[in-house]
């Protein structure tokens, strides 16, 4: 099966790269021949429908191809496309990809593949290929300008299996103010039950797991900030939330073993080697797992 047939299912693609093909379709529309007529309202529906048709049914192999096509497109498009159109088009593509991966599929395997394919770009938050830092709209709308990052969305929905992957890749450690993620996990209103594999998830239990995972990354968690929010009338999703934050994160001295984990992970993060670099260290497997936040 060719690359285009794997990606497009029943829709044939005239070019090997799905994003180049989309641009060609946009250019061929008579209403878009003049630059002054370009804008989200003109071509966003077509881009979204095309990518949604792919992402709705795509498997991991097809998603790998789609990400490879997007990376190749972004790396070359800047030289060939009008600047504003290029920015708008890539924003629509990123918004659609993140929406389907995080809000619709919620599949850890897809999230990990996305991180693997784009980890080399994650240090530049402004780059279109640093997908994990881009914003998207969880309830899909054309413009992602008022959206949220994948990490914040996962914290809001308490998807602990996906949060663990993001943390293993050092995404929380790269946050400027990681306590905001803890506050979101604990205090964000739970409006819906999350479906995973057609089963209802216990959000409270997932929230507990999320707090434990964050405690494996952070050296301190400000209880004062949490209590300040509670004093303003906000309600925690977990009544006994303090039981899930080790006392060594807010009161007692931090464990030496945990401080070593933080230091080693920070060095690996600086060299963009999380999490794979952990498993090249000549240490026992149990310590590798500890560094990888398994315990």
Curated annotation (Swiss-Prot):
Name its pathway: Protein modification; protein ubiquitination
Q: Residue ranges of the SOCS box domain? A: 232-295
Q: Which SMART domains match?
A: SOCS_box
In terms of PROSITE patterns, this protein maps to: SOCS
Identify the stretches annotated as ANK repeats: 146-176
Q: Give yes or no: UniProt keyword Glycoprotein.
A: no
Is Magnesium given among the entry's keywords? no
Q: Name one GO biological process term.
A: protein ubiquitination
Family annotation (Pfam families): SOCS_box
Q: Which UniProt keywords apply?
A: ANK repeat, Ubl conjugation pathway
Record-annotated membrane-spanning stretches: none
Q: What does the record give as the function of this protein? A: May be a substrate-recognition component of a SCF-like ECS (Elongin-Cullin-SOCS-box protein) E3 ubiquitin-protein ligase complex which mediates the ubiquitination and subsequent proteasomal degradation of target proteins.
Q: Which PANTHER family match?
A: ANKYRIN REPEAT AND SOCS BOX PROTEIN 17
Domain text from the record? The SOCS box domain mediates the interaction with the Elongin BC complex, an adapter module in different E3 ubiquitin-protein ligase complexes.
- Family that this chain belongs to: Belongs to the ankyrin SOCS box (ASB) family.
Q: What is this protein called?
A: Ankyrin repeat and SOCS box protein 17
Query: What gene is it encoded by?
Result: ASB17
């Amino acid at each position: 099966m060719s690359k285009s047939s794997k990606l497009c299912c029943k829709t044939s693609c005239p070019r090997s790269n799905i994003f180049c093909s989309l641009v060609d379709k946009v250019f061929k529309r008579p209403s878009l021949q003049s630059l002054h007529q370009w804008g989200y309202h003109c071509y966003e529906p077509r881009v979204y429908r095309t990518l949604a048709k792919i992402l709705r049914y795509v498997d991991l192999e097809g998603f790998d191809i789609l990400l490879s096509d997007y990376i190749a497109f972004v790396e070359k498009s800047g030289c060939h496309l009008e600047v504003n159109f290029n920015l708008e088009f890539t924003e629509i593509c990123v918004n659609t990809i993140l929406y389907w991966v995080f809000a619709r599929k919620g599949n850890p395997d897809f999230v990990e593949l996305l991180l693997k394919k784009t980890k080399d770009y994650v240090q530049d938050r402004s780059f279109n290929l640093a997908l994990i830092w881009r914003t998207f709209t969880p309830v899909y709308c054309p413009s992602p300008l008022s959206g949220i990052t994948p990490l914040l969305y996962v914290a809001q929905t308490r998807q602990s299996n996906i949060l663990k992957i993001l943390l293993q890749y050092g995404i929380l450690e790269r946050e400027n103010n990681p306590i905001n993620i803890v506050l979101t996990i604990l205090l964000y209103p739970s409006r819906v039950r999350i479906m995973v594999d057609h089963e209802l998830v216990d959000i409270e239990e997932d929230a507990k797991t999320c707090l434990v995972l964050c405690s494996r990354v952070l050296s301190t968690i400000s209880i004062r900030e949490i209590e300040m929010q509670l004093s303003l009338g906000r309600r925690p999703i977990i009544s006994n939330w303090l039981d899930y934050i080790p006392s060594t994160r807010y009161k007692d001295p931090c464990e030496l073993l945990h401080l070593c984990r933080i230091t080693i992970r920070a060095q690996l993060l600086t060299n963009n080697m999380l999490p794979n670099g952990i498993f090249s260290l000549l240490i026992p497997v149990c310590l590798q797992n500890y560094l990888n936040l398994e315990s």
